[in-house]
Amino acid sequence: MFTDLLHSSYFSLFLIVALGFMLGRIKIKGLSLDVSAVIFIALLFGHFGVIIPKELGNFGLVLFIFTIGIQAGPGFFDSFRSKGKTLILITMLIICSACLTAVGLKYAFDIDTPSVVGLIAGALTSTPGLAVAIDSTHSPLASIAYGIAYPFGVIGVILFVKLLPKIMRVNLDQEARRLEIERRGQFPELGTCIYRVTNASVFNRSLMQINARAMTGAVISRLKHKDEISIPTAHTVLHEGDYIQAVGSEESLNQLSVLIGEREEGELPLDKTQEIESLLLTKKDMINKQLGDLNLQKNFGCTVTRVRRSGIDLSPSPDLALKFGDKLMVVGEKEGIKGVARLLGNNAKKLSDTDFFPIAMGIVLGVLFGKLNISFSDTLSFSPGLTGGVLMVALVLSAVGKTGPIIWSMSGPANQLLRQLGLLLFLAEVGTSAGKNLVATFQESGLLMFGVGAAITVVPMLVAVIVGRLVFKINILDLLGTITGGMTSTPGLAAADSMVDSNIPSVAYATVYPIAMVFLILFIQVISSAVY
C-alpha cells in the first residue's frame, strides 16, 4: 500500500516536503539546511524511483522566480546604478573561471568537447546552457555529462552558501542590520523643530517668495502668528516674532535656521480644529503621481510633512513619485484630512489583498518573453529561457509599478507564501529528477567526470569570494546573491534567502542572473565550436 502511495506524485511531493522540513530543522554546531533539506530528501526518493512531474517543477520555478522579481524590482535598478558594475564584473569572473577550469581539465584528462560543455551546464545548473550544448555539439554525450555534474551543481552551491558565513565568521543578521542602518543613512532621518522669525530679510514676505522648501528641503508645517496657530500656504506672509514649525533632515533644518532665524526645540501645538493623521496610498489612480500634482494645500488645506516607504521616512518634495502602500503624514483640518483620505484610498485591507490577475498575466508575459530567440548571426543566438524570461519581466513590471488599472505588486505575506510554495515544488522535482540517475552515472562514468564537474562548481565560487571580499570589499549578503546568481543557482538563492531576513541577496541575484545566463550561453557556444 505504501509503495502504491509513493507512485502518487501528490502524496510523494508532500511527504518529501514534510521530511525535508524535519531534516532542515536539525542543527549541528549552529548549522542547519532549512528549506534546502527538501532537495536532499528528494534525491533519496528519486534514487528509489519516485518521480515528481516536470510540469510541477516548472510551475514552482515560475512562481518562485516571479515573486523574487516582483520584490526585487525597485531595488534592482537602484542596485544596478550604485554597484552594478562591480557585481557584473564578479559574475563575468565566475563564468570565465568556470569555463577556463573546464577547458583546462579537458586537456589534462583528455575529455571530449561535448562532455566538457555538458559538465559546464550541469555544474552551473543551467538548463538553457544544456540546450545550447546539445544544439552546438549534436552529441548525446553533453546530456550525459550534464546529468553527472548536475547533482553536485545543486548540492555544492547550497553547502557553499551555508558554510561561507561560518567560515568567514560573519553573523548574517548583524550584517543585515548594519547594512539597513547604512541604507537609512542615504535617507537622513527626519526631525521636527520650531523657529522664531528674526531674519529681517524674510519679514513681510510670503513663503512663495522666500522659497524655503526649494532652498533648504525642509517642509514648513505650522505657523504661529500672535496667538493663532495655522497651517501655512504658499501665500502665508511671515512677520517679525512669528513662530514656524518645520520637518526635515538635520542639514535642512540647520539651513532653514540661517534663512528664518533662531532655532528652538519643541513643537507648536495643533489648533483644536486641526489634526495630524497617517494615510495610506491604496488607490490605483494615485500610483506614480507626483506629490506636487495633488495640490493638497490648495484643494484640501492640508500639508504632507513626511512620506514613509519601506520603513524609511522620505522628505515630501513636490517631485516625489508616490508608490502603492506609501504612508503619508498629513496635517490639516478634520474635513480636509477626510478629503485627502478619500483621494489616496487609505484602505489598509487593500495592502493585504492578493489580486491574482497581475500574477498570472506577469507570468504569461514572462514565459512568452522567454520563448524569444535573438539571433546575432547564423551560428550565434540567445533565448532568455523560462527562468530568465519570467525574472526579467517581473523586474521591469515591479519597477513600473502600474499599467492602467493593473498594479504590479504583491503584499509581503502573499509574496512569501507563493515564493515558498514555488520553491518547494521546484526543489522536490529537481531532486527526484537528479536522484534517479545518480548511482547509475557514477557506476558508468566513474569518479573522474564527477570530480571535474565538482571542480567547475567550486572554483568559480572561490574566485568570487577572493575577488569580491579582498579586492572589492563587497558585503557578504551581496556576495551570496552574486554567487548564486552568477552560478545561475535558484536552490542556492533559496539557501541564502532562508538564512537571513533581508532581500539584499535576492536583489543581487536578480541584478546578475540575466548577465550570467547570457555569458554562459555565449561561452558554451564558443567552446563547442572553437575547442577541440
Swiss-Prot record:
Its main location: membrane. InterPro entries: AAE_transporter (IPR050144), RCK_C (IPR006037), RCK_C_sf (IPR036721), YidE_YbjL (IPR006512). Keywords: Cell membrane, Membrane, Repeat, Transmembrane, Transmembrane helix, Transport. Residues 179-262, 263-346 form the RCK C-terminal domain. The keyword Flavoprotein does not apply. The chain crosses the membrane at residues 7-26, 30-52, 59-77, 87-109, 116-134, 139-161, 356-376, 386-408, 421-440, 445-467, 474-496, 506-528. One of its GO terms (cellular component) is plasma membrane. The keyword Isomerase does not apply. It is a multi-pass membrane protein. GO terms for molecular function: monoatomic cation transmembrane transporter activity. GO terms for biological process: potassium ion transport. It comes from the Bacteria. Belongs to the AAE transporter (TC 2.A.81) family. PANTHER family: K(+)_H(+) ANTIPORTER SUBUNIT KHTT, TRANSPORT PROTEIN YIDE-RELATED. This is Uncharacterized transporter BT_0500. It comes from Bacteroides thetaiotaomicron (strain ATCC 29148 / DSM 2079 / JCM 5827 / CCUG 10774 / NCTC 10582 / VPI-5482 / E50).
